[in-house]
Each structure stands twice: as C-alpha cells, then as structure tokens.
Curated annotation (Swiss-Prot):
GO terms for cellular component: cytoplasm; mitochondrial outer membrane; mitochondrion. Heterodimer of a catalytic subunit qtrt1 and an accessory subunit qtrt2. This is Queuine tRNA-ribosyltransferase accessory subunit 2. The gene is qtrt2. Coiled coil: none annotated. It comes from the Eukaryota.
C-alpha cells in the first residue's frame, strides 16, 4: 500500500492510494471515504442494489463491535468476512467501533478495550482482538486503542495514560500480527490519540510513526468532541509529525463542512456513516456542491439545506423531537408535512435512482406509513449525494477552486 500524492494545495492532499488488497490491484482516490457497513452490509441496501451506485469506494469498512459476538462463525468458515458476506471485489478495512453509534465510555483498562454488540459489552484483550482480526481477514485494520479521552473535562493525566495504553496496545498487536498467518498480507493502522492536548497528540503521532504501520487513524475528533477550529488546528499540527507517504484516516467526522475543514488540515480518508445517520432521521441530503451548475436546472429548484432561505447554516437548536434535534444544515426532513404535495425529486438534477424515479411526496408517504422502501430510497440518494460531494471536492482541489467549492457548500443557497 502506497499513497501517491499528485498535489498538495493549502494543506489539502490530492492523490491515489495504490497497492490495496491482497492482489495490490485496487486503488482509492484521496480525499475520499470508505464504504460504511454494519455487519458487512450497507444498511437498507442489498448487494445488487448497492452496485447500482456509481463511483463506489474501493474500500469497505467493517467494525469489530458488529462482528465480535459471533466471530466464531467466521473462524469456522475460514475464508474471511469478504466471502462470508458475499461482498463484491473490495478491500476490507476493519475498525474498532462503528462511528454511527457512539459507545459508552469508562470501560478501558491497561490490558483490555471494550466494544458493544447487540448483547452488551464485550471485553477484548489483545489476543482476543487479534483472533477476531484473523477470522475477519481484513486487508488493513485499526489497532486497539484507548479512545475515551475526547470529553472536554478529561484531565491531562488521563489523556497521557490513554496515549501510553494505545502505544502499548499497538506494540502487542504488532507482535501478534507477525505470528498470524491469516494477516500476513494485511496492513495495521496505528491510532493517534491525545484528546485536545496538543503535546500529547504530538507525542502520540511521533511514537506511532516509529512503528511499522501502514497508515494512521486520527481518533477522538468526532463532531461532539471539540470545536471545529480546535479540531483543525490539532489535526494540522499532528499531521506534520506523520510521514507524507502514508494515509491518514479520521474517525467520527462526516458532516460536509467538517470534512472540508479536515481535508484542509491534511486528512486523506473519512468514514461514510453520515448518509446512514441522515437516512435514519428520515432526511435527504440536499446541499449543493456544484460550483458551476447546469444552466438548464439552475434556479428551477435549488438544492436547499433545511429550507434555510440562504442563511449561513447553523446547527438547529435542541427540540423535543430527537430526529429534528440531530438534524444538520445539510439535509431536508421528508417527514415534514410540507412535502406531502411536493412532486419534485429530492434534489433537482440528481441522477440517483430515487431522484430519477420518485418524488418527495412519495418518499414522505413511505416515511409516514413506515414502509421499508423509504430507507432503501433514501440510502440510495444519500450515498450517491455523499460520494458526489467527495468527487466534487477532489475536482475543486485539482482545478484550484477549493474556495469556490467551500462557498458553494456552506453559503451559496436559496430557499425553496
């Protein structure tokens, strides 16, 4: 696995991650995202339905928390999760947690970490963690880590302990990795911890970079962890300590504005759990990412964000409705009664199956009647929109129009 950078513009790294998979024939453009799954399946979508989407990421993300409870089945199968789940020809990346469902804190020791499955907490030693990786047979995977120091009130002593534990876990995983035949072609990603303390972030990055890892996972930067400006500064200074030729994956960052900020700070890869979260709220991604819109569709039905009438996007204030409370300024709530008689596509000009075949009113009907098809159509649209956003981001960096792209995504909107 090798990261070949073609451009570095104002901190943004444009390139291709090559040599992926056992055959080394796969590649992934950066900045880019992994394909988020639960139990090795994209939520709401069958494999055939998923493959109707274009520009799917070459790397599929699975997580230990969704596989740990029944990994004995994978051990008996002996051919890994890719074949077990009937996945297409893809590269498997195995993370520790599913960022779409934050885990309870307070269950990490010097020797163990905990993940949460459907049956509750599962405590993992390094040996058990590596036995799960051997059963999954990923192409690359995240090392064990103590990632519970993202809270604002975490003491410096606790953060230092988390960095020490994470480095110790990495060393133990590296030893077991060398002894595991099923992982002889796999790459291990070291985890950079340190909370919001720059000194510990730098120490974690420097020490992790000394180990024989294939890439780096930047943990503890998810949306609720810290202010966006603080996150960007920490990532930028931490990234300066990491080798240029190895990829950097940030966990827990999915909102378009946060993705752009992290790309400017030097991040290469992201997860794609955000479209799933939007789908679960009964919402559709509707933000505009086209710098030069098609003149035939421009002005007919502008892509809107919370129907905000051109206002700069802000997170909605908490309300009694949990779905509305968690909404971001990049989506529309199709459960809202205003869409009952709205016969337009979810986003004008979108080429996804949902927008080509159906209208807002129909998806609204499916949602209020609790039809399973609602999740299928929304997931198809949201994934297509999110993947289109990343492609447009790469194109903007290529053409030196990142600022125009940011203005388009964050500010240049008109109300419906």
């Amino acid at each position: 696995m090798k990261l070949e950078l073609s451009r570095v513009v104002q901190g943004c790294r444009l390139g291709v991650l090559t040599g992926l998979g056992k055959s080394g024939q796969h590649s992934l453009e950066v900045p880019g995202c992994l394909l988020h799954t639960r139990c090795a399946t994209v939520p709401h979508l069958t494999q055939d339905t998923l493959l109707t989407l274009s520009d799917l990421p070459a790397v599929t993300q699975v997580s230990v928390d969704s596989l740990a409870e029944h990994h004995e089945v994978l051990e008996e199968f002996k051919e890994g999760v890719r074949k077990f789940a009937g996945l297409h020809d893809t590269v498997i990346f195995c993370s520790l947690h599913d960022s779409a469902s934050p885990s309870p804190a307070g269950h990490v020791t010097n020797k163990t970490v905990s993940v949460w499955g459907s049956g509750g907490r599962i405590e993992l030693t390094a040996a058990r963690f590596m036995s799960i990786q051997a059963a999954v047979q990923p192409d690359c995977y995240q090392s064990m880590a103590d990632g519970e120091t993202w809270q604002a009130n975490t003491s410096r002593k606790r953060v230092r302990k988390a960095v020490d534990r994470t480095l110790a876990h990495l060393d133990e995983c590296l030893v077991l990795h060398q002894k595991t035949q099923e992982l002889k072609h796999a790459e291990i990603f070291g985890v950079v911890e340190g909370g919001d303390i720059l000194e510990e972030r730098l120490r974690s990055a420097r020490e992790t970079a000394k180990r024989p890892v294939g890439g780096f996972v930047l943990d503890g930067f998810h949306s609720s962890a810290m202010d966006q400006d603080v996150r960007a500064q920490l990532i930028q200074e931490t990234s300066a300590e990491l080798p240029q030729e190895k990829p950097r994956l940030v966990l827990g960052v999915g909102r378009p504005d946060e993705v752009i900020s992290c790309v400017e700070a030097g991040v290469d890869l992201f997860e794609s759990f955000f479209p799933f979260q939007v789908t679960e709220r009964g919402c559709a991604l509707s933000f505009n990412y086209t710098i030069d819109p098609d003149p035939e569709t421009a002005g007919t039905s502008a892509s809107t964000v919370l129907e905000c009438n051109g206002e700069t996007p802000e997170v909605k204030k908490p309300s009694a409705n949990e779905d509305v409370e968690n909404m971001t300024p990049f989506e529309i709530n199709l459960k809202d009664k205003r869409y009952r008689d709205d016969f337009r596509p979810l986003v004008e000009g979108c080429v996804c199956y949902c927008c080509q075949k159906h209208m807002r009113a129909y998806v609204h009907h499916l949602l209020v009647t609790n039809e399973l098809l609602a999740g299928v159509l929304l997931m198809l649209h949201n994934m297509a929109h999110y993947l289109g956003f990343f492609k447009a981001l790469r194109d903007a960096i290529t053409s030196d129009r990142l600022q125009d792209f940011k203005n388009t995504v964050l500010h240049r909107r008109q109300g419906d």
